[in-house]
């Protein structure tokens, strides 16, 4: 049986699984879908065309599915889609997409979103991502799986944060962070490969060694960007255990629109 506090407001049309728990003074809009075993904290607002999967935990005073902070937005029925097993802590704001992009803001599974985080319209957040308290994502930001963003950091619109990368606290990021790379500062600069994170996630010593070699080519050997890309492609085809990881790095760089941090 759904446990809805008597002070909560669940508008007609909302689709709520019978195992959902909704706390005091929470508001759930008419176009919201909430999956099994999800809990909605007190005073939080779930609105817009928002879909929450299973086993999510929404903290007190969170605002999920609000209107995009985009002056071009004209009340189009854009969406927010959140997967399973996400923790979204107090006072977080997550907005729906815009028709100027694909119209959907997405969060995957198993993400840890700490207090006061902002995830703007049309953002794409992968799986197992950590966004620390007060991290601020502008519109259209893409965050790869297992990435970490430190507290009090700001990320410019359309920036991409690669898988397994890490952005240090109180940083300002205006260009893409390649996968596996640590960055920090205002403006953010590269500070090596995220070796400890890769070890924890089961990357082999050979793969980590290959990524370290790739980092040296990209940042330490005095090569031009185009020269570095040529040698990175050669490294990705070396026939070693790290080829797949280096190929991921190369493909990310090739797809960059804003350029990577240098």
Swiss-Prot record:
Its main location: cytoplasm. It catalyses: a (3R)-hydroxyacyl-[ACP] + UDP-N-acetyl-alpha-D-glucosamine = a UDP-3-O-[(3R)-3-hydroxyacyl]-N-acetyl-alpha-D-glucosamine + holo-[ACP]. GO terms for molecular function: acyl-[acyl-carrier-protein]-UDP-N-acetylglucosamine O-acyltransferase activity. The keyword Lipid metabolism applies. The keyword Coiled coil does not apply. Pathway: Glycolipid biosynthesis; lipid IV(A) biosynthesis; lipid IV(A) from (3R)-3-hydroxytetradecanoyl-[acyl-carrier-protein] and UDP-N-acetyl-alpha-D-glucosamine: step 1/6. Its EC number is 2.3.1.129. Signal peptide: none annotated. GO terms for biological process: lipid A biosynthetic process. Keywords: Acyltransferase, Cytoplasm, Lipid A biosynthesis, Lipid biosynthesis, Lipid metabolism, Repeat, Transferase. One of its GO terms (cellular component) is membrane. Coiled coil: none annotated. It is found in: Cytoplasm. It is an enzyme of class 2 (transferase). Homotrimer. Belongs to the transferase hexapeptide repeat family. LpxA subfamily. This is Acyl-[acyl-carrier-protein]--UDP-N-acetylglucosamine O-acyltransferase. The gene is lpxA.
């Amino acid at each position: 049986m759904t446990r809805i506090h008597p002070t909560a407001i669940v508008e007609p049309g909302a689709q709520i699984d019978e195992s959902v728990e909704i706390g005091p003074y929470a508001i759930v809009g008419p176009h919201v879908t909430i999956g099994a075993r999800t809990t909605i904290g007190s005073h939080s607002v779930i609105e817009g065309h928002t879909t929450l999967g299973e086993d999510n935990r929404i903290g007190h005073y969170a605002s999920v599915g609000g209107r995009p902070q985009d002056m071009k937005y004209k009340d189009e029925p854009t969406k927010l889609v959140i997967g399973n097993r996400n923790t979204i802590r107090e006072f977080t704001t997550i907005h729906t997409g815009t028709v100027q992009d694909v119209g959907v803001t997405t969060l995957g599974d198993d993400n840890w979103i700490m207090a006061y985080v902002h995830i703007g319209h049309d953002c794409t957040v992968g799986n197992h991502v950590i966004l620390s308290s007060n991290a601020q994502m502008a519109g259209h930001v893409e965050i790869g799986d297992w990435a970490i963003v430190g507290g009090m950091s700001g990320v410019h619109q359309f920036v991409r944060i690669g898988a397994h990368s890490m952005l240090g606290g109180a940083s300002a990021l205006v260009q893409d962070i390649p996968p596996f790379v640590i960055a920090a500062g205002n403006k953010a600069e590269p500070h090596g490969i995220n070796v400890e994170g890769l070890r924890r996630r089961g990357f082999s010593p050979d793969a980590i060694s290959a990524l370290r070699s790739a980092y040296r080519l990209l940042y330490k050997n005095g090569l031009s960007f185009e020269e570095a890309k040529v040698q990175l492609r050669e490294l990705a085809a070396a026939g070693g255990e790290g080829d797949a990881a280096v190929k991921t790095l190369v493909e990310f760089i090739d797809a960059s629109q804003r350029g990577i941090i240098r």
